[in-house]
């Protein structure tokens, strides 16, 4: 047993240096707090243990929001991606989502270097095994080597490491992701402090050798010609991109899986943890959708300096020899060489309703949770929570008001509100359908929504803020110009409109009104707009969206105004729900457990009815009129 010694004093200690831990540590340090980040292995900083991608549907929104607030994820992927695509372009702008294929090692190395060079930040390869708490307030952490680091706040960003258990068919052993060590001691410390834990499960597919793949039997998927960056600070990225490939399962794949389903830990009871609904294993897909003739499988490179390829959509915990047989049924993989075996991993996570909207634990002052510890899944969800936890831990130490994003502010607000208000019984994944105001929460306007907030907090630099103000002014000035510029029904203009399958003008209208026609866009009208200033492409895209969706946007703004009325009705911190006459027993229990900060949050708690909300509103009126 190690002899304890004084490791030093810090303002904030971050436990874990994955995507949540990196954002938390950088936010804290950049806000001037003396910060320590602890990781089991320095080489696992910003590790991508599963898919080699950043972004995707709804997740791309999160990355843009992290960037708009002054986080690092967007800039890091812009510097290290090997393919970029905008998804859902056939649909409306609310669901357009950027997705980039990462060079995994480059992504890690760059993020590690950013942390190493950051002022106010120290990094240690060390395992935290215990939290020190006095009188309900965190005072430090204890490590396996005996170091005691005193601090004012701790951010837990432990990923899937807490009591991690790897499962492959009949084989199981204690382990973290990607062959790393688990963290087996910290869970007990949390239990001793009264924190409620439960077991979740996730998994990752096999990795294969590129030399053994016949790409001629697959469908090639290229990146976009016009590369759109994640970060609002990145400009005009030109880069040679790699291809990804698409193949499909077939009857033979299904037969092998069905013949061996009894050896699947998911189906024979070996796995106790709850897995992600929206990222099922291939055996789960086959059994849950027996009538589906085939499933898409994506073959994606893991980087430029490796031949490893990721088999997306083929996550499994079946025995290794079964996995090899399954892989060889896929067109193009008949002679495949498996380099890494697919596995499932079980791990401890918390019930996130134990957290405040700031991500601080309700019953342990100065202790924050972020990422998969909180029951979420995904790099982007983790990064978003880490950023907010880092900001709020720093603001609390500075005795400033916390940053709480609402559901009408950001996808980050939806994510955190869902976790701390509703909780989750499975790994939570962000989706556009979870956001009520998604037309307002587009990925293209994240800076308009959040950069002012990031600037006020102190995380957005002057350079970024000046760039944002210039972009904002460009859009506002151009919209005003279009509203005041008339288009006359001249012959040449009507001929131009007819060429674009648009109706002739019967009377003079403004360019703004003309642009509201669905068949026209801002870039089309350049030919008849000689006064147009030279503006960046992203400004033109904003003009298109703001003109064409003006009515829908206004409608959602009105909905948000109603939503905010309830969000502004704050509930007293010391409220005793048992004393409020008229509340149902279930509502009293749920409200006492969640302890919502506002009537708005109370309305979203499962088990709290509209009648209960009416009782609360009457109570509040009497409370504030005393």
Curated annotation (Swiss-Prot):
<dbReference type="InterPro" id="IPR020595">
    <property type="entry name" value="MnmG-rel_CS"/>
</dbReference>
<keyword id="KW-0819">tRNA processing</keyword>
<comment type="similarity">
    <text>Belongs to the MnmG family.</text>
</comment>
<dbReference type="GO" id="GO:0030488">
    <property type="term" value="P:tRNA methylation"/>
</dbReference>
<dbReference type="InterPro" id="IPR002218">
    <property type="entry name" value="MnmG-rel"/>
</dbReference>
<keyword id="KW-0963">Cytoplasm</keyword>
<dbReference type="Pfam" id="PF21680">
    <property type="entry name" value="GIDA_C_1st"/>
</dbReference>
<dbReference type="InterPro" id="IPR049312">
    <property type="entry name" value="GIDA_C_N"/>
</dbReference>
<dbReference type="InterPro" id="IPR026904">
    <property type="entry name" value="MnmG_C"/>
</dbReference>
<keyword id="KW-0285">Flavoprotein</keyword>
<keyword id="KW-0520">NAD</keyword>
<dbReference type="InterPro" id="IPR040131">
    <property type="entry name" value="MnmG_N"/>
</dbReference>
<dbReference type="InterPro" id="IPR044920">
    <property type="entry name" value="MnmG_C_subdom_sf"/>
</dbReference>
<dbReference type="GO" id="GO:0002098">
    <property type="term" value="P:tRNA wobble uridine modification"/>
</dbReference>
<dbReference type="GO" id="GO:0005829">
    <property type="term" value="C:cytosol"/>
</dbReference>
<feature type="binding site">
    <location>
        <begin position="16"/>
        <end position="21"/>
    </location>
    <ligand>
        <name>FAD</name>
    </ligand>
</feature>
<dbReference type="Pfam" id="PF13932">
    <property type="entry name" value="SAM_GIDA_C"/>
</dbReference>
<feature type="binding site">
    <location>
        <begin position="275"/>
        <end position="289"/>
    </location>
    <ligand>
        <name>NAD(+)</name>
    </ligand>
</feature>
<keyword id="KW-0274">FAD</keyword>
<dbReference type="Pfam" id="PF01134">
    <property type="entry name" value="GIDA"/>
</dbReference>
<comment type="function">
    <text>NAD-binding protein involved in the addition of a carboxymethylaminomethyl (cmnm) group at the wobble position (U34) of certain tRNAs, forming tRNA-cmnm(5)s(2)U34.</text>
</comment>
<protein>
    <recommendedName>
        <fullName>tRNA uridine 5-carboxymethylaminomethyl modification enzyme MnmG</fullName>
    </recommendedName>
</protein>
<dbReference type="InterPro" id="IPR047001">
    <property type="entry name" value="MnmG_C_subdom"/>
</dbReference>
<comment type="subunit">
    <text>Homodimer. Heterotetramer of two MnmE and two MnmG subunits.</text>
</comment>
<dbReference type="InterPro" id="IPR036188">
    <property type="entry name" value="FAD/NAD-bd_sf"/>
</dbReference>
<dbReference type="GO" id="GO:0050660">
    <property type="term" value="F:flavin adenine dinucleotide binding"/>
</dbReference>
<dbReference type="InterPro" id="IPR004416">
    <property type="entry name" value="MnmG"/>
</dbReference>
